[in-house]
Amino acid sequence: MNATDTGMQADPTDLIQRIASLTRMLRDSMRELGLDQAIKDAAEAIPDARDRLRYVAQMTEQAANRVLNATEAAGPIQDGMARGAQALDERWQQWYDQPLELPQARALVQDTRAFLAAVPQHTQQTQAKLMEIVMAQDFQDLTGQVIMRMMDVVGAIERELLQVLLDNVPQERRDEANSLLNGPQVNPGGKADVVTSQDQVDDLLASLGF
């Protein structure tokens, strides 16, 4: 954009001040992100946003591996119980259909009692694996805070950059785009003067000639 071509006299000092303010805001936000007390113990060694994203990816991968390992360990336990129960059920059905000799009946009863005696142990093993799956989800508390804070930072930067653009474009373009400045909102509540999607952000930039 050329101030001479548009008839506007841009104020370089004001633009520089805005950029400086944006830089300070970014640095302050990143500093706050690094020192946030809720995640300090787990993430205080991560110095910048790139490392934070790597941290989120690592935590997610670790949780996925824990879930997969627990599932793979619990599967054979459940399969074994299912096969044992099915085999006993078939043997009992055969006895009902045709009475067994005493030694065979005694063996069936003993096998059934042995199966039932092993059920609590198998149940405890399965419960332990289920608890491991539940505990693997604890990463969401930490990574969720990191992601939400970074989203807030990105949203604030986007709004500030859009405001800088609006303040330095011709008046006719500013009037067209100004109603979209209020920024992306998850729940616009029926308002027509807010940006509700990334497409509208793109439309706003297009209306400004970018």
Swiss-Prot record:
Keyword list, A-Z: Chemotaxis, Cytoplasm, Flagellar rotation, Hydrolase, Protein phosphatase
Transmembrane parts of this sequence: none
Listed GO CC annotations: bacterial-type flagellum; cytoplasm
Keyword Membrane found: no
Gene3D superfamilies (UniProt xref): Helix hairpin bin, Single helix bin
Keyword flag Cytoplasm: yes
InterPro entries (UniProt xref): Chemotax_Pase_CheZ (IPR007439), CheZ_family_phosphatases (IPR050992)
Protein EC: 3.1.3.-
Molecular function GO labels: phosphoprotein phosphatase activity
One GO BP annotation of this record: archaeal or bacterial-type flagellum-dependent cell motility
Localization: Cytoplasm
Marked site: Enhances dephosphorylation of CheY-P: Q145
Top-level enzyme category: hydrolase
Family affiliation: Belongs to the CheZ family.
Assembly mode: Homodimer.
Function recorded in the entry: Plays an important role in bacterial chemotaxis signal transduction pathway by accelerating the dephosphorylation of phosphorylated CheY (CheY-P).
Protein name (record): Protein phosphatase CheZ
